[in-house]
Amino acid sequence: MQPALTTAIPARKFKLTLLGPAFIAAIGYIDPGNFATNIQAGSTFGYQLLWVVVWANLMAMLVQTLSAKLGIVTGKNLAEHIRDRLPKPAVWAYWVQAEIIAMATDLAEFIGAAVGFKLLLGVTLLEGAGITAVVTWGILMLQSRGQKPLEFVVGGLLLFVAAAYIVELVFSRPHLPSLLEGALFPGLPNSDAVYLAAGVLGATVMPHVIYLHSALTQHTQDQGSVPQRLHTTRVDVAIAMTIAGFVNLAMMAMAAAAFHSSGNQQVAELESAYQTLTPLLGQAAATLFGLSLVASGISSTVVGTLAGQVVMQGFVRFTIPLWLRRAITMAPAFVVIAMGLNTTEILVLSQVVLSFGIALALIPLLILTGDRALMGEYRNHPVTQAVGRLIVALVIGLNAYLLVAMI
C-alpha cells in the first residue's frame, strides 16, 4: 500500500502546480470598466440586470477554457497561430489592432487605480497615477522570478476584491428574494436597460485576456499529460471565473441595495459612488470600495501589460522589457489626466474601442480549437462549436448595438 500512496501524493501536487493562469485571466473581468458599468446598472435598474452578469460569466468561462486548451494542446498561443496562418500584411494589421486594444484597456485600468488612490488618500489624480505606476512596476518585476510569484500576487488581489465585496454585501444588506429573481429570470424593462445590458456583456468578454490565457498555458508540456492538464485547467477556470462572476454580481447587488433602494438612481461615476456610500453605509464601506478599486486597477493593468507583451511576441516575434512596455502604455494615461478629461468617459470609451477586437479574437479561437488537423482528439465537440458561434453572434451583435448607441 505504501508505494501507491507515495505516487498518489506527487500526482496531487502536480495538478496543484497547474492552477493559477485562470486567476490572471479572471482579473480582466473585474477591471474598473466593470465597476463603472455594474454600479450604473445596479443604481438605475436595481436587481433587474443581474441575470446578464450570470450569463455573461458563463460565456466567459467557455471562452477562457477554449483559450487555455489551445495553448495546452498545441504549445502555441492564439497570436502565434494567427501569425502562422495569415499573410504578413494581415498579421501586422492584426498586431496593430491587438496592441491598440491592449493599450486602450490598460488606459482605463490605470486611471481606475489612480482614481482609487485619489479617493482613499486625498491626493490629486496625477499623484494617484504616480503611485499606481510605482506599484505596478514593482509587481511586474516579479515576472523575472517566473510566472508563479505573479500568479500568487494577482490571485491574491482577486481574492481581496472578492472578500471586500462580501463585506460590502453585509453592509448594504440586499433583498435576497429580489436578488435571486434578478439573477435567475431575464428581463429588460426598457431601451435604457438594453443599452446597459449590452455594456455589461461588452465589459465581460475581454480580447486581451483571450490572447494572454493561451500563452500562460502553452509551456506546460513537462507538467503532466494533456488530459491531466486540460482537467486541471477546467477546474482552474471554474474557480477563478466563479470568483470573478461573484464580484460582478456583488457590485451590481450592492449598487441596487445601497443606491437604487434609497432613491439614488443616477450614480454612474466612481467618485460619486464613493461619496454616496459614505452617508448611506458608513466610511468603512466607502473605504472598502476604494481599496477594491485600487486592487482591481493595479492587478488589471499588470495583466494588460502582460497581454501586450504576448501579442507583440506572438504576432511579430519581437519583445521589449516589461518596464519599458509599462512606461509606454502608461504615457497616454498621464496625458489624459493632465488634460483634465472626465475619467468615467474614458472608461466608457475604452469599452467602445474594446468592442472592435472581440470578434477578431473570438472567431479565430473558435476556428482553431474546432480544427481536427490542429487539435486532433481534443478538437471542440460540435455542441461546443455551436454554443461558441452563438456567443460570437451575441457578443458581436450587442457590442455593435452598444457602439451605434454611443455614436
UniProtKB/Swiss-Prot annotation:
Coiled coil, from the record: none
BP-aspect Gene Ontology terms: iron ion transmembrane transport
InterPro entries from the UniProt entry: NRAMP_fam (IPR001046)
Cellular localization per UniProt: Cell inner membrane
Record-level Gene Ontology MF annotations: cadmium ion transmembrane transporter activity; manganese ion transmembrane transporter activity; metal ion binding; symporter activity
Topology of the protein relative to the lipid bilayer: Multi-pass membrane protein
Keywords: Cell inner membrane, Cell membrane, Ion transport, Membrane, Symport, Transmembrane, Transmembrane helix, Transport
Pfam families membership: Nramp
Membrane-crossing residue ranges in chain numbering: 16-36, 43-63, 95-115, 119-139, 152-172, 193-213, 239-259, 288-308, 318-338, 346-366, 387-407
Ribosomal protein as UniProt keyword: no
One term under GO cellular component: plasma membrane
General function of this protein: H(+)-stimulated, divalent metal cation uptake system.
Family per record: Belongs to the NRAMP family.
Protein name: Divalent metal cation transporter MntH
Gene for this chain: mntH
